Amino acid sequence: VVQREQGERGRFPWLRTPHMDRLAAEGVRFRNAYVTLPLCAPSRAVFLTGRYNHLNGVANNRTPFPADSVTHSTLLRAAGYTTAYIGKWHMGNQSGKRPGCDYSASFIGQGRYVDCPIEVNGVPTPSKGWVDDVTTDYAIRFMREHRDRPFAVMLGYKATHGPFDPPERARE
């Protein structure tokens, strides 16, 4: 779980995140992580590959992710994990299944907040509703289907990217 916007305990004292706090307490936390390029796609490419941008080839939001890249999903897959990439990809306008993953459900480019077309394993699939709810549902389904064996899911949310358009339930 990469959860950078809310912070855990204390960054925004009024924001209660008990589940994130529990994950942080029971998992691994990187409290001082830095990026070499402060854009979402280059940062995502570094996270996926563990390589600086001048080595992984993604230097801006328009550059497609090199399909032959070795990702953490590639390595986990080789170790027997079933892997998935779900949600915001946005490295160029790249279509198709995500490199190193057994399963992908993501959208092209910035996508849309509502009724965003999702590509499931490269197949365009209409969706209904707020995009982060839709991608969360894909992630939950994947985890339920694979709960009896090792799996790894990377889920990228759109909501942290402008222009901001929260779901109806959060507008009041």
Model-based region annotation:
Residues 1-172:
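Formylglycine-dependent sulfatase
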